[in-house]
């Protein structure tokens, strides 16, 4: 992921499930599009081993290549799903993809079976934002992935995570999203940077000691 993306402050954190592995099935990515928009994505490939990491790399590379020619997240997810099915992919993957116009704050996003994103506001409030979309990638042929457009204000941070951050044996998804949203909103209220917010969210997830890969992506307009 580039160190600098014009108009945005983006921070990412990752912790693999297995000790000794630098990578697992979770991934994130952010890159500049030809039209000046910035593509941001986070995903979770099935499994935690080396094979999961290899599959994750295929999905991530495919999405980046498709994004160079497709106009929106809906098209990228649709064609990635078709590609994985045509390849007979042995695994599936969930993903959220956003296209962000850093000047206007317009965000277009779609979801493929991934956990909702969080919007953390400067006033200390937060929202759980469930984007429209379809099933996980690589399972159902001809699946549709409708998208949604909304505005990212400058006093708001988008927090994107994988399920290991917000769900586990002793933590329901709803409770985990609420917990993470509250933590992120307090960080934004306190004036913390995207990097500091990402650290807080990851550290809180690590403390739960869930046996899963963890990925966090925080996005703010500057």
Task: Give the positions of each predicted feature.
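Divalent-cation-assisted or electrostatically stabilized phosphate/pyrophosphate-binding catalytic cores
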Residues: 153, 175-188
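PAS/GAF/H-NOX family sensory domains and closely associated sensor/linker modules
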Residues: 71, 191-192
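… and, occasionally, acidic/histidine-rich disordered N-termini of signaling adaptors
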Residues: 1-159, 199-203, 208-222
């Amino acid at each position: 992921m580039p160190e600098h993306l014009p108009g945005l402050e983006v921070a990412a954190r990752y912790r693999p499930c297995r000790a000794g592995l630098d990578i697992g099935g979770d991934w994130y990515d952010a890159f500049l599009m030809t039209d000046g928009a910035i593509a941001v994505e986070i995903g979770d490939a099935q499994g935690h081993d080396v094979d999961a990491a290899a599959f994750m790399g295929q999905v991530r590379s495919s999405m980046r290549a498709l994004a160079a020619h497709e106009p929106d997240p809906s098209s990228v997810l649709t064609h990635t799903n078709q590609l994985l099915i045509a390849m007979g992919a042995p695994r599936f993957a969930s993903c959220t993809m956003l296209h962000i116009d850093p000047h206007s704050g317009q965000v277009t996003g779609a979801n493929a079976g991934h956990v909702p994103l969080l919007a953390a506001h400067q006033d200390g409030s937060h929202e759980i934002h469930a984007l429209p979309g379809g099933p996980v990638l690589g399972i159902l042929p001809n699946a549709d992935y409708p998208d949604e457009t909304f505005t990212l204000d400058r006093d708001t941070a988008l927090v994107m995570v994988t399920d290991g951050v917000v769900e586990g044996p002793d933590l329901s998804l709803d409770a985990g999203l609420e917990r993470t949203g509250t933590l992120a909103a307090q960080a934004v209220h306190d004036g913390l940077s995207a990097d500091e917010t990402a650290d807080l969210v990851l550290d809180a997830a690590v403390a739960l000691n869930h046996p899963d890969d963890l990925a966090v992506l925080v996005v703010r307009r500057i």
